[in-house]
């Protein structure tokens, strides 16, 4: 289905240890995490909170297991803080990823975000940007995009539950007000369906701008409980709203077909944060790998 050597398969460490809730998977070590990724048949990983920041140490650990770094999350605060603060941290992050051989930097605006707040209802309190904030976001992303390209990288914007860029309309707004040469899009199946969006619409409309893909599934019965009981994003994660592709309600066949017939080259990263005490990360990594092999021929 996919052209040879166009797709690399990664998996996010958040299934082993959760950066937002460190108590989830606190017992799982960095070495266990990356060893199980490799054993499950993946080529790479994004970066978690237990990963060494020393690139020499990290490279050695990954090379022993034939793994690479696909990318790493970067929180921007372009709508709420001076640009200089974000830029200073971004340059360090960019240089780290450049040293690790990554080609994309995952960015997500966290100004006014509720994704990290345990007791704030997700669907009732989602932030909505003002026009001034949209302009600050676009200008800031253009600046970061140029900084990324100085080292041969691209920024990919991660639409995300509980943030100001979550819905179809918000993604469209962001794409409309940003330069496609500087700001690319991360396509995340799980966050789109969780929000009630139509992922194929976003995929088809912005295919040329998509430079990174997160494969994530959802358990609809848990999402329904999140809405009914007015739970937060973190409570949704703890209750099992997300799971690996093939274990939830999302249909991936057409997603894979569209991407296979496109010029997309890069990573597919399985990202499914759930409680590792309830969903064994290695078992679920194997499930995801088998599903991708079966459905995408990869």
Swiss-Prot record:
Catalytic activity: scyllo-inosose = 3D-3,5/4-trihydroxycyclohexane-1,2-dione + H2O
Classification via Pfam families: AP_endonuc_2
Assigned keywords, A-Z: Cobalt, Lyase, Manganese
UniProt GO molecular function: manganese ion binding; myo-inosose-2 dehydratase activity
Record InterPro entries: IolE, IolE/MocC, IolE/XylAMocC-like, Xyl_isomerase-like_sf, Xyl_isomerase-like_TIM-brl
Pathways per UniProt: Polyol metabolism; myo-inositol degradation into acetyl-CoA; acetyl-CoA from myo-inositol: step 2/7
EC number of the protein: 4.2.1.44
Domain of life, source organism: Bacteria
Keyword Ion transport: no
Single GO biological process annotation from the record: inositol catabolic process
The protein's required cofactors: glutathione; Co(2+); Mn(2+)
Matches recorded under PANTHER family: HYDROXYPYRUVATE ISOMERASE, INOSOSE DEHYDRATASE
Listed NCBIfam families: myo_inos_iolE
Family assignment from sequence similarity: Belongs to the IolE/MocC family.
Official protein name in the record: Inosose dehydratase
Provenance organism: Bacillus thuringiensis (strain Al Hakam)
Gene behind the chain: iolE
């Amino acid at each position: 289905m996919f052209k040879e050597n166009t797709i690399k398969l990664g998996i996010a460490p958040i299934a082993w240890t959760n950066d937002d809730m460190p108590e989830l998977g606190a017992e799982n070590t960095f070495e266990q995490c990356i060893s199980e990724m490799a054993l499950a048949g993946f080529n790479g990983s994004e970066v978690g909170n237990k990963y060494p920041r020393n690139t020499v140490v990290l490279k050695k650990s990954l090379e022993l297991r034939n793994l690479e770094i696909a990318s790493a999350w970067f929180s921007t605060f372009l709508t709420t803080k001076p640009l200089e603060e974000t830029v200073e941290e971004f340059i360090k992050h960019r240089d780290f990823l450049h040293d690790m051989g990554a080609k994309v930097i995952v960015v997500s605006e966290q100004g006014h975000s509720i994704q990290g707040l345990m007791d704030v209802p997700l669907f009732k309190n989602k932030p909505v940007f003002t026009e001034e904030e949209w302009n600050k976001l676009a200008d800031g992303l253009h600046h970061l995009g140029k900084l990324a390209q100085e080292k041969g990288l691209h920024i990919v914007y991660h639409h995300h539950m509980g943030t100001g860029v979550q819905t179809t309309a918000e993604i469209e707004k962001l794409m409309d007000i940003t330069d496609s040469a500087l700001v690319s899009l991360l396509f995340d199946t799980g966050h789109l369906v969780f929000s009630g969006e139509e992922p194929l619409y976003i995929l088809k409309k912005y295919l040329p701008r998509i430079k990174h893909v997160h494969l994530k599934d959802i358990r609809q019965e848990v999402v329904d409980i999140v809405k009914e009981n007015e739970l937060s994003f973190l409570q949704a994660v703890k209750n099992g709203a997300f799971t690996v592709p093939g274990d939830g309600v999302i249909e991936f066949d057409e997603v894979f077909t569209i991407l296979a017939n496109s010029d997309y080259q890069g990573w597919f990263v399985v990202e499914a944060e759930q409680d590792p005490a309830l969903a064994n990360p290695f078992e679920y990594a194997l499930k995801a790998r088998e599903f991708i092999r079966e459905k995408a021929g990869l």
